[in-house]
């Protein structure tokens, strides 16, 4: 008599795990949400949570496709995509990278945004780079973006030179020749509401604000974490080079000390934005913009100012 093997219970059979499939160069992908089709190009960037590809839509717009990495389960990636899209749509602003579309294709999540020419980080590689030439134009756009985030109760938490971009806007009458330079704040993936702020949300270890390193000494985390980060970026532009600080240097106030050595009006504006104690730091983006237009306050005042 032939022994019968036990048959599996269909209810116990799990469906195959969904796998994200990256796009290939030249592939045309259509969004069911908008009907727009995107011809995929080369990989142009990569972050903690996504890979970015160049692409063009049917209107010949130069765009970027952020493809979310399959970190965690399909459900977790979908939740992350939905959260980021919600923020991008809610926080649409001329000084924040613009979102065009979002969709799922082959169990892979795409977020389509405008394509920027390069990050501010790449500007530092220009030969004989003079950051002071760029400081005020970048500050004007960046601070407007930060102001818009804050009045909508969001904090970016991760502002640095790789997350601020130069965008080239073409002249429709002379698209190959004339282009206007604009600056945009991007990567809102880790942005949080005011009541969701946590020390663990700040990603870049080299730019952790003092209040993250020692909240008992320097104060609680609030929206002024963005002011500190903007201050660090503008300090880099003022010195025309990338700067990195150890936690010990941040706690000792080295960024502020470097700001004090600058010429007016930068020394007053940036030393105030880079104060270690949150309660003495620049209150908001508008105040920092006004400080950048304030005449010299005097070296003695700066040296005696709260740190």
Feature names for model-found ranges:
Residues 41-47, 52:
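Protein kinase glycine-rich loop
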Residues 78-90:
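AlphaC helix of the eukaryotic protein kinase fold
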Residues 102:
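Activation-segment/catalytic-loop signature of the eukaryotic protein kinase fold
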Residues 150-167, 172:
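Catalytic-loop of the protein kinase fold
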Residues 106-119:
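Conserved short submotifs of the Hanks-type protein kinase catalytic core
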């Amino acid at each position: 008599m032939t022994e019968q093997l036990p048959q599996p219970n269909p209810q116990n059979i799990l469906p195959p795990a969904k796998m994200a499939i990256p796009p290939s160069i030249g592939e045309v992908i259509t969004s069911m949400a908008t009907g727009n089709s995107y011809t995929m190009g080369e990989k142009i960037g990569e972050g903690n949570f996504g890979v970015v590809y160049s692409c063009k839509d049917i209107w010949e717009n130069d765009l970027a496709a952020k493809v979310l990495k399959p970190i965690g389960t399909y459900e977790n990636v979908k939740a992350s995509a939905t959260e980021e899209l919600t923020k991008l749509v809610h926080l649409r602003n001329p000084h924040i990278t613009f979102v065009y579309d979002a969709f799922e294709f082959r169990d892979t999540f795409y977020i389509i945004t405008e394509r920027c020419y390069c990050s501010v980080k790449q500007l530092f590689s220009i030969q004989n780079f003079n950051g002071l030439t760029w400081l005020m134009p970048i500050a004007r756009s960046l601070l407007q973006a930060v102001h818009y985030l804050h009045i909508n109760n969001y904090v970016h938490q991760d502002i640095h030179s790789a997350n601020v971009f130069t965008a080239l806007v073409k002249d429709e009458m002379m698209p190959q020749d004339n282009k206007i330079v604009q600056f945009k704040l991007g990567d809102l993936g880790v942005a949080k509401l005011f009541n969701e702020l946590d020390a663990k949300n700040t990603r870049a270890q080299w730019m952790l604000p003092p209040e993250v390193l020692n909240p008992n000494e320097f104060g609680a985390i609030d929206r002024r974490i963005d002011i500190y980060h903007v201050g660090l970026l503008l300090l880099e532009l003022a010195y025309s080079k990338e700067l990195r600080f150890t936690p010990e240097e941040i706690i000792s106030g080295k960024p502020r000390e470097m700001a004090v050595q600058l010429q007016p009006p930068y020394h007053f504006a940036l030393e105030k934005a880079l104060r270690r104690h949150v309660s003495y730091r620049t209150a908001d983006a508008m105040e920092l913009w006004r400080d950048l237009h304030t005449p010299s306050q005097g070296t003695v005042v700066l040296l005696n100012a709260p740190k």
